[in-house]
């Protein structure tokens, strides 16, 4: 696979220079929440089960406090994002275990590869 879009069933694909791929016009985005756009690589639209996406945060964008039902893998491709535990810059991999609770903010904007095993639940602090 060479652009945006998920592979068909039982197919393999390779995205070389993932950050550069996100700049191509055929790489489609949808608004996930204000200031955060998503390009879904695979997974269901209702977020049930494993899902992989590229998220693009505008400067100052955030995702409110939530709980992870499964592991979350975040690879920061460009920019930075932060949560209660620290600031994560480009080329940083963060793996959050099931049950992790946090909110995420990107002061400067960022692009991340995000893989969820299970959906997140928005919760009060």
What is the predicted role of each segment?
Residues 82-106:
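Short acidic-glycine-tyrosine-enriched beta hairpin
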Residues 50-52, 110-111:
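Structural motif
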Residues 58-61, 68-83, 90:
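Glycine- and acidic-residue-biased ligand/ion/polar-headgroup-sensing regions
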Residues 43, 53-55, 64-68, 85-86, ...:
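Short histidine-centered beta-strand/loop micro-motifs
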Residues 98-123:
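Ligand-binding loop in jelly-roll beta-barrel domains
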Residues 1-49, 125:
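A short, N-terminal "cap"/entry segment at the start of jelly-roll beta-barrel domains
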Residues 38-40, 52-54, 73, 93-95, ...:
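Conserved hydrophobic/aromatic beta-strand scaffold that supports enzyme active sites
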